[in-house]
UniProtKB/Swiss-Prot annotation:
This is Nitric oxide synthase, inducible. Binds 1 FAD. FAD binds at H403. (6R)-L-erythro-5,6,7,8-tetrahydrobiopterin binds at R11, W93, F106. It comes from Oncorhynchus mykiss. Its EC number is 1.14.13.39. One of its GO terms (cellular component) is cytosol. Homodimer. Keywords: Calmodulin-binding, Cytoplasm, FAD, Flavoprotein, FMN, Heme, Iron, Metal-binding, NADP, Oxidoreductase.
């Protein structure tokens, strides 16, 4: 019922069609929301449900958890019904929306059937009521099948004319797990708003259509040792056996893979190189999505860039602002109606802010020394960097071969020298936070990205990671 914790904590708060706060909670908890294998969804979900149960109990409102409800139902089955007699039960409705096989009801076999006579959901009374006054009753308008057929034909004719004037586009995908297909379907829906786009699997693609393509978009994963998925083998053989293209079409490629393997996105780069060799024109640089590091975010950013480049290439203007879910965070243009900067009430120091942004432990260090281990005559460069750790309660845990990420900072003297040339500079100890308004929720949401410490830190302390100061 309504007062079972999971109905509120899972369904109401975490369903995509409802409040959908799961990712926001995960970011505030400092979880790696860009990597599904970190199981951040499960951790955030449990935390939300614990908070819901605690808030009800704190205010002395009765609520039950899903484990207690499941055990209570199993006890009800044992005591009320003998073994030879069973009543209908709907497994989908009775099993809680979290914990799965940890609840005993998950393993209970059920049969869902209807015993007659049976009262279904009550129909609308005004549809079945017998009106005493005939003028008040609802009169159904009779529409002939011929009229419906004419309307459908007219609509399809108009749509065909609109699509005929659009640029043809084909979205191809090759996948083993279905991830590439999901992303390709999402991209195809966006392209259909401005192009005459179609979605095909590589094995279903008629390769003779390659000469007539205006825009070819390829979304694929890499399988095995840099090879193609099973449904992309035929396309790969035909493409790499091709010598030239008479029609120099445009194309763009997005590859999916995992950096755990040495041949990361090798198939995508091979297809990109072959199309370029055949003379096709690349619309946007090849994108890469790492399964272990923000694959969805990488695809969203690449898709927006590809759409903008395609619009510019084919001179398409006046189109709607198309975005993927959550892609408003990748928008480069400042929109006062969508973005705002607010003063952070609880300022964070620079190390804490960087740790929260990247969901990793960041330790303050100073550069002690650096030496080039190669000889001056060598064309190679191997630099030994020694870092001196500052005082910090954090324990440094590492293993040989680990990679190191560095967030360099500028000298305070350089920062102060540049700040004096900027008009109306805010206090150097002021923290700002960027907020954006989502298309799904018409409210300002925090990005989780603290504009660390003012103009002093934001513009000058962190700027070397993005560009070079004069």
């Amino acid at each position: 019922g309504w007062y079972m914790g999971t109905e509120i904590g899972v369904r109401d708060f975490c369903d995509y069609q409802r409040y959908n706060i799961l990712e926001e909670v995960g970011r505030r908890m400092g979880l790696e929301t860009h990597k599904l294998s970190s199981l951040w969804k499960d951790q955030a979900l449990v935390t939300i449900n614990v908070a819901v149960t605690y808030s009800f109990q704190k205010n002395k409102v009765i609520i039950t958890d899903h484990h207690s409800a499941a055990e209570s139902f199993m006890k009800h089955l044992e005591t009320e019904f003998p073994p030879a007699r069973r009543l209908p039960a709907d497994w989908d409705w009775l099993v809680p929306p979290m914990s799965g096989s940890l609840t005993p009801i998950f393993h209970q076999e059920m049969v869902n059937y209807i015993l007659s006579p049976f009262f279904y959901y009550q129909p609308d009374p005004w549809m079945t009521h017998v009106w005493r006054n005939g003028e008040m009753c609802l009169k159904k308008q009779q529409i002939s099948f011929k009229a419906v057929a004419r309307a459908a034909l007219f609509s399809s004719t108009l749509m065909s004319r609109v699509l005929a004037n659009r640029v043809r586009c084909t979205v191809l995908y090759a996948t083993e797990t279905g991830k590439s297909q999901t992303l390709a379907q999402r991209l195809n829906s966006m392209l259909n708003c401005a192009f005459n786009s179609r979605l095909l699997c590589m094995e279903d693609y008629n390769f003779s259509d390659m000469e007539q393509e205006s825009l070819l978009v390829v979304v694929m994963s890499t399988f095995g040792n840099g090879g193609s998925p099973g449904n992309g083998e035929s396309f790969k053989k035909q493409l790499f056996s091709l010598q030239y293209l008479r029609n120099k079409s445009r194309y763009c490629v997005f590859g999916l893979g995992s950096r755990m393997y040495p041949q990361f996105c090798a198939f995508a780069h091979a297809v990109d190189a072959k199309l370029e060799e055949l003379g096709a024109e690349r619309v946007t640089p090849t994108g890469e999505g790492d399964e272990l590091n923000g694959q969805e975010e990488a695809f969203s950013a690449w898709a927006l860039t590809a759409l903008k480049d395609a619009y510019k290439e084919f001179k398409i203007q006046g189109q709607l602002s198309l975005q993927l879910p959550g892609a408003e965070r990748f928008c480069e243009a400042w929109d006062p109606l969508r973005h705002r900067v607010a003063v952070e009430s609880c300022p964070q120091d620079r190390i804490t802010a960087l740790s929260a942004i990247h969901s990793k432990a960041v330790l303050p260090m100073k550069l002690k020394s650096k030496h080039n281990l190669q000889s001056p005559q060598s064309s190679r460069s191997t630099i030994l960097v020694e870092l001196e750790r500052e005082r910090s309660p954090e324990v440094m845990d590492f293993a040989p071969g680990d990679h190191v990420g560095v967030f360099p900072g500028n000298l305070p003297q350089l920062v102060a020298g540049i700040l004096k040339f900027l008009p109306q500079t805010p206090p150097t100890n002021q923290c700002l936070r960027l907020g954006y308004r989502s298309d799904t929720f018409r409210v300002m949401r925090k990005t989780g990205r603290l504009l660390d410490a003012s103009q002093h830190s934001l513009c000058l302390r962190h700027s070397p990671t993005s560009w070079t100061l004069p």
